[in-house]
């Protein structure tokens, strides 16, 4: 997931305005060497600096550093960001070494046309650190994040310009969007199975018709369970909510990871997406677990057979192959519903290559 840090400059009033713009644009990592305590009065902020009161330790801003310097700084328990100005091949070699130990490597180039940034990033494919490019404006941030085949993980915008900061916020949201290749699975079973503990996920975002969450009993496939965006004769719409399924079910979270529905709580992040597979990351505001009658749904796509359980109610919907919500009370064998399939198994929510049987 792409990200940005902001480095304001000038007088405190200039910096203050830029920091407020940053927070309002979703950026809470600020590089500032002088005003950590004052900045933190403006909001919940992570400070990157070379001072002891920093949250992330900055090394190399004014001097060359070594791998030993990084390791020593990490003994404090803080993350370490290594700042390297690229002027020659020796600097490129230094970056390749620091990238194996530092948590972040910030690259500053005086002339990327002479020393191509893309080549440096491509040489760091085995790195453990996040690569950040120091940029003076939005256009160079866009180049670093979006244009190159091997873009950086993030950017450090050294600017006080509120318009530039807000444009960068919109860009980060755009390039960080995930997408999922949804398939039309054929329903093979719809069966009432009795009472169980079902989870409603209330988010901090309003969803639209066609939006939902990926939920299912198997790691190999998750159904697109529709949000409560439609009115019914029984209840008003709740466009921030997905009545997702029972406590054991997987739900998709950012970076293609899953959580159990029962694990979710306020402040966690989950993925919502539309029928085209275009995804957004949203914040969980509340989770409700209640005993409700459940319905078992099974579907098949090619050689993959998947299952999920949902509350047995007219207001619970999946999404059909036309991108339209369909109530589970009307679902029948032979209907087509959208689902996401994966050949990977799951270990602590992460996709892994492992043979696994789910039934």
UniProtKB/Swiss-Prot annotation:
GO terms for biological process: amino acid biosynthetic process; aromatic amino acid family biosynthetic process. It catalyses: 2-amino-2,3,7-trideoxy-D-lyxo-hept-6-ulosonate + NAD(+) + H2O = 3-dehydroquinate + NH4(+) + NADH + H(+). Keywords: Amino-acid biosynthesis, Aromatic amino acid biosynthesis, NAD, Oxidoreductase. InterPro entries: DHQ_synth. Its EC number is 1.4.1.24. GO terms for molecular function: 3-dehydroquinate synthase activity; dehydroquinate synthase activity; NAD binding. It comes from the Archaea. Pfam families: DHQS. It is an enzyme of class 1 (oxidoreductase). Belongs to the archaeal-type DHQ synthase family. Catalyzes the oxidative deamination and cyclization of 2-amino-3,7-dideoxy-D-threo-hept-6-ulosonic acid (ADH) to yield 3-dehydroquinate (DHQ), which is fed into the canonical shikimic pathway of aromatic amino acid biosynthesis. This is 3-dehydroquinate synthase.
